[in-house]
Amino acid sequence: MEIWNAYTADGQLTDHTLTRGESIPDGLYHLVVECIIRHRDGSTLFMKRDNTKLSYPDYYEATAGGSALFGEIAEQAILREVREETGIELTADQLRHHTHFVAHDDQCIFHCYWAETDWDKSTIQLQADETSNYIWVPQENLKYFLETELVIPRQKDYVERLFLEQEQGKSENETQYNMR
């Protein structure tokens, strides 16, 4: 059973707890964290969702992440989620806070990060029933990858804002990217 802290929409911690799978009372929210992983060489990690996933099966995820567990703050939760979902061990000083927003329909408060690492790219771990593959997409192929592959739309927007807006005006190299 997964237990979460409950927050108000403005991010204030309450005395309530929430349980995954149970309805969330009106006016309460749970904390969700996501992190885009960037390698020091400029490539971005995408994890392919398992084809048995209910939402976005066989789509690429640009982030590792999930719900913060009871007692965790956002930074603790994202370090744990990245380790569980990819095997990458990040430190808090590698995290760069990108944005946060409230998804009222889902009763979630999202904290979104990105991090740069020099982790061995060949040692990414897949999570059974969660992910089926991964790919490191070089910066010069990122625009093409986002245009031609199934990527979760909201995460695609993050990647574009973070790593492609700086590229506007430059010529794009649309060579094929290499699967692992």
Label for each model-derived stretch:
Residues 3, 9, 14, 20, ...:
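Glycine-rich, flexible loop/turn motifs
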Residues 10, 39-42, 50, 116-121, ...:
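Short loop segments at secondary-structure junctions
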Residues 21, 58, 70, 97-99, ...:
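Nudix hydrolase/Nudix homology domain
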Residues 16, 47, 98-100:
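Residue-level detector of high-confidence beta-strand sites
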Residues 1-34, 40:
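Acidic, metal-coordinating catalytic segment for phosphate/diphosphate chemistry
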Residues 89-98:
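A short coil-to-beta-strand element that immediately follows conserved catalytic motifs
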